[in-house]
């Protein structure tokens, strides 16, 4: 559910992987925009019609994306009543901002009017609907469906609205469920943007990514899918889950191509706020850390300080998600073909993902410890050369004599 600016990507991503996707949104205008931009194939007004079309395409093994005009809570409950159980159920509705969440019984236009007339009543209705939606997702999970939160803060918002925490957290967030093993390798949504605006630069960098990360099936699969299916919007750019070691090697190789004139350049390297060592969010990215460090906000600040010391071109301390409940660090590093850029990239592209590996190693993840010790699968033999302790916080020794100071 949720076909907005971020949620609309669910249909495109699903089709890229050969899936049949049914996406629900209460605002017909939003679905129509997704269709106009080729993010969605068609729009229907009933779940029954969507199911019929979905089954037809499943039989033919043909991917398709179907937008259903309706409220997520209503449609999820209807699907359960009809025992329609998809393989995966999630949502990208604006739960983190309940005033933008459309309550049951309202169209997008009606919600706009209601919101302006009685903000308090609107929020009450939105939160009531949100709890119905989450309970439906929990029921899907109980019936064997892969159901999870996609980072919308739905569980936290429902808890704040009175839903018991134990009940709300019967589904996981996707970071704890699926992404954290990647974080342990320093992977995350690493981004490069071709400032020249020339699509040929992006094509050359796609080729370079495949060269640098040869044998990394995650990178290889993604680059080949992305260059085939994703259009260029504004400046040519790519996001890719490269990890510790890979990012540094790639960045230095890009700078070399700019020196040689094979890439017009410059190229800006950045990443999402959701990255291995850049965020603390106890209700999502950093939930259920083995050492109990869900709330430790030192990590993103340390990330920012390290990037500053490494010569990063831009650093931003930010907070979003659940209106002040999280802290994260944004960065940008520039490759312009100069020797100075080599120095900056060598350092910044090491520490930015490296501190994420350290964070997860300190929390107790063995795969992250392996990366730190030079045994990472994609790190190319690189290790993280700082003092490390693999003990719980109350047993860590910081004094030179090895004595723990309280």
Question: Which residue ranges define each predicted feature?
Answer:
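Catalytic or ion-translocation cores adjacent to nucleophile or general acid/base/metal-coordination motifs
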Residues: 3-59, 63, 90-135, 170-182, ...
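Core active-site phosphate/anionic-ligand binding loop and the adjoining beta-turn-alpha structural block
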Residues: 48-250
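Extended hydrophobic packing segments that form well-structured cores
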Residues: 356-406
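Extended hydrophobic secondary-structure segments that form protein cores and membrane-embedded regions
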Residues: 1-2, 69
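Short, solvent-exposed polar/charged micro-motifs at secondary-structure junctions
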Residues: 76-79, 158-161, 277-283, 325-327
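Conserved mixed alpha/beta core segments that line enzyme active sites in large multi-domain catalysts
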Residues: 1, 219-325, 332-338, 342, ...
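Short, solvent-exposed amphipathic alpha-helical segments in soluble enzyme
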Residues: 15-17, 80-85, 106, 163-166, ...
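Structural alpha-beta junctions
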Residues: 18-19, 85-88, 139-146, 261-264, ...
